[in-house]
């Protein structure tokens, strides 16, 4: 009798769990535990958490040996060893929310991730289109494999963790925060937008051809004025911007300890270009970095984490998808952040959580993003929710996408956050492109 894994939710958890299938010779040789416990028909994790946690999930085989007569009838039991189940691992993911994410994406290319802004728990992480992992349990047919493999929307790629995109104007909250933190600007600082900026013979255009006129930080964020952020980036410089961006999780893996396919992305600085491209940084590159284009590459989960840390008031969080052995509740996490203390629940070590020099600067950015969604002429005003219990802040943008199998194309990005609630959502739509963090 063969007992096998079953995935009752079909394609809902595919890019979180991965799947199991029979190991090949190399996989057996590379893992001592699998070597010790291998029996014909055994299945191991091939992808996702199934693969990363294989040594915890694998159990020990039960053994029963019998003496039989010439007719094959058992006459005496010689040995009986009880098998043991593998470890039970509980995820932070909420199945109903995960299913709802899949329904929203409806097999279109994109991703949605939901993160608790205080505990860092991943509440949902859905990459679309998905596929049914049960197909791999007993060997997928050639026709079924080719159907998945040749799908132009790339269901085999976990877009939340492995999709690299230019964040576009969704980066503007970090640009604003960095400039405020470094005292380059304040709330009174204004720029006159005529629809373009001339610099050393180059023209850098704002998305609004006729310009926005004189704009302050709040109005520039609300209307996503490129000219304002060109000037702010010019005054700030890419190196100081890089420091702030990396503090908030850009250019770093978010869930790398769980998923070996996650990409770290890139937030460039002058040293990176010199070391990797052998050329010096030019000022025009700073300007386009300030509106989220150029060399920047981010994953949706990074944008989710970035926005979560803005939403919670500028406190560092440790994203996780496995429930801690001693989990901290949402209420306790929120209270500890507000009191200035937060512990890593696994190690009980104090986290260095303050990501800001002046908390007023976080508040200024939150209010500017709130205006973008809830005030007239805001770029995401049409997405607003009038009920005060569910109001959120947001940032829209358009950027060039870099995909593994697609040429560059236009991508709309939208970051949304609920600054006074408990979740951050990252949403990326790749065919009719959009990103949100709520």
Regions found by a protein language model. Name each.
Residues 27, 204-205, 437:
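Short, well-ordered strand-loop elements centered on a beta-strand within folded domains, enriched
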Residues 50, 218, 362, 437-438:
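Short, structured helix-loop boundary elements
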Residues 429-438:
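Single conserved hydrophobic/aromatic residue that forms the stacking wall/gate
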Residues 112-117:
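Short hydrophobic alpha-helical segments used for membrane anchoring or interfacial signaling
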Residues 68-78, 118-170, 174-430:
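Beta-lactam-recognizing serine transpeptidase/beta-lactamase-like catalytic domain environment
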Residues 24, 61, 109, 189, ...:
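Secondary-structure boundary/capping signal
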Residues 1-111, 126-159, 164, 331-348, ...:
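Extracytoplasmic/periplasmic proteins that interact with beta-lactams or build/remodel peptidoglycan
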């Amino acid at each position: 009798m063969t007992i096998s894994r079953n995935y009752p939710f079909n394609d809902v958890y595919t890019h979180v769990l991965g799947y199991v299938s029979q190991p090949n010779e190399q996989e057996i040789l590379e893992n001592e535990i699998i070597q010790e416990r291998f029996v014909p028909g055994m299945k191991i994790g091939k992808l996702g958490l199934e693969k990363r946690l294989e040594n915890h999930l694998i159990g020990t085989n039960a053994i029963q040996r019998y003496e039989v007569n010439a007719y094959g009838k058992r006459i005496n039991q010689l040995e009986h060893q009880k098998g043991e189940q593998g470890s039970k691992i509980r995820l932070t993911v909420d199945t109903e929310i995960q299913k709802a994410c899949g329904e929203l994406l409806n097999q279109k290319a994109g991703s949605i991730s939901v993160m608790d802004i205080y505990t860092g728990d991943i509440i949902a992480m859905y990459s679309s289109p998905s596929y049914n992992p049960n197909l791999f349990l007993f060997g997928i047919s050639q026709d079924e494999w080719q159907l998945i493999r040749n799908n132009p929307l790339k269901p085999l790629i976990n877009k939340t963790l492995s999709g690299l995109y230019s964040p576009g104007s969704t980066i503007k909250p970090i640009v604003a925060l960095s400039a405020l933190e470094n005292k380059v600007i304040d709330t009174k600082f204004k720029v006159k937008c005529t629809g373009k900026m001339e610099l050393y013979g180059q023209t850098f255009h704002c998305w609004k051809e006729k310009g926005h006129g004189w704009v302050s930080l709040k109005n520039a964020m609300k209307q996503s004025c490129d000219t304002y952020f060109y000037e702010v980036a010019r005054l700030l410089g890419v190196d100081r911007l890089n420091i702030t961006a990396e503090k908030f999780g850009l250019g770093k893996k978010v869930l790398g300890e769980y998923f070996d396919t996650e990409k770290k992305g890139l937030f460039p600085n002058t040293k990176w270009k010199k070391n990797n491209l052998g050329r010096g940084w030019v000022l025009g590159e700073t300007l386009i970095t300030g509106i989220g284009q150029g060399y920047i590459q981010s994953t949706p989960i990074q944008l989710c984490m970035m926005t979560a840390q803005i939403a919670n008031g500028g406190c560092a969080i440790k994203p996780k998808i496995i429930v801690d052995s001693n989990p901290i509740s949402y209420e306790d996490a929120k209270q500890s952040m507000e009191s200035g203390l937060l512990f890593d629940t696994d190690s009980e070590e104090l986290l260095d959580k303050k990501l800001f020099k002046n908390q007023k600067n976080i508040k200024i950015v939150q209010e500017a993003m709130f205006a973008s969604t809830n005030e007239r002429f805001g770029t995401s005003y049409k997405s607003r929710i009038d009920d005060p219990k569910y109001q959120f802040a947001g940032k829209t943008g358009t950027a060039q996408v870099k995909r593994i199998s697609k040429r560059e194309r236009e991508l709309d990005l939208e970051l949304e956050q609920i600054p006074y609630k408990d979740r951050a959502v990252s949403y990326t739509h790749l065919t009719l492109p959009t990103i949100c963090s709520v």
